[in-house]
Amino acid sequence: MPIAADTIKYGPWTMGVRYDLPPEDIGPNGLQDMLNTRLTQSAGIEKVLGTKSYENAAALAGTPTVTACGQFRVPSTGAERVFIVAGAAMYYYNSGWTDITGSVTITAGDDNTFEWVRAFDTLVLTNGVDAPIKWSGTGNAAVLDVDSRFTTADHVAFFDNRVWMANTNADEDRVWYSDAGDPETWGASSFYNLGSPVRGLQPLQNALAIHTEDFIAV
């Protein structure tokens, strides 16, 4: 015969994981421990997928910190290039990781993360610590020519057929832009002063959003 019982409900886990409380003090919306799982934004639980070597490639010597990772398509040839910056070197995958650092200086550091964009057939990267880098998808990487307008830049975007860079070593509130169609020609007056440190650049359809500490300019 049927047994009268209460429904047992699990989640949503809005209380989160409370490692600081004994299990008996945690309500039905809380967790005491988790393993290989994580909470979603809607307070659900999903499995952590973990990591796997790309194409089963051997690990880089010394296990350096990866500060850039992406897939770069060269439109003129259709070539697809998977690249990483790890430690003080840049690599792309070609039946194994091939070092393409060349003469470029890359300062290793856990916080020296790169932003990158594709500008026509050129990959452009910047980390705010070293000179901006370019790579064509073949050969070695090289320093991007910015006509000595600045030395480093924190942020980069590609919009209106121009490369945009912001928060440079000289002016944290300034946004520079290259000539249309030429990522390596930068006019002496090709910049905007925002009056507030720039914290990000994001193309939005027909506009470029410039995020500063105090406002967003479009």
Regions found by a protein language model. Give the residues of each.
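A broadly used, surface-exposed interaction patch
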Residues: 96-119
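Short coil/turn segments at the loop-to-beta-strand junctions that recur within blades
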Residues: 104-110, 147-153, 195
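Hydrophobic or amphipathic alpha-helical targeting/insertion segments
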Residues: 111-146
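N-terminal beta-propeller domains
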Residues: 1-98, 151-218
